[in-house]
């Protein structure tokens, strides 16, 4: 049986501006120390979308997260099952990387972390 922990949300409050990119992907534990790794499951690039309030930004992110997660759920599950069958433990990060441009600065961070473990069985 697979046990999934609660999602951990980490995000910064952005000033009013424009979201320029959006990316969703999981990372294997072995990929954490690498510059780039994992599988791109869902990504979309948006430009010139002005979001005047934090509430609208959060709503947009939540919508895209839900959409992309369900679109990629089967792939995520197959990857988890393959990994768990070998190691017994699987941890991965679904990183939603938001690049939010405001004047000359860019702010990028919004991360959801899942930990999946194979339930131990006594023999």
From Swiss-Prot:
Keywords: Cell membrane, Membrane, Transmembrane, Transmembrane helix. It is a multi-pass membrane protein. It comes from Pasteurella multocida (strain Pm70). This is Uncharacterized protein PM1123. GO terms for cellular component: plasma membrane. It is found in: Cell membrane. Its main location: membrane. The lineage of its organism: Bacteria, Pseudomonadati, Pseudomonadota, Gammaproteobacteria, Pasteurellales. The chain crosses the membrane at residues 55-77, 92-114.
């Amino acid at each position: 049986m697979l046990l999934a922990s609660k999602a951990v949300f980490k995000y910064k409050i952005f000033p009013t501006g424009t979201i320029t990119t959006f990316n969703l992907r999981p990372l294997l534990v072995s990929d954490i120390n690498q510059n780039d790794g994992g599988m791109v499951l869902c990504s979309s690039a948006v430009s010139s979308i002005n979001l005047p309030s934090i509430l609208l930004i959060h709503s947009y992110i939540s919508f895209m997260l839900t959409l992309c997660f369900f679109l990629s759920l089967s792939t995520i599950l197959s990857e988890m099952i393959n990994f768990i069958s070998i190691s017994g433990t699987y941890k991965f990060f679904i990183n939603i990387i938001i690049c939010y441009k405001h004047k000359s600065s860019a702010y990028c961070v919004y991360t959801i972390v899942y930990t999946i473990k194979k339930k131990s069985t006594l023999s």
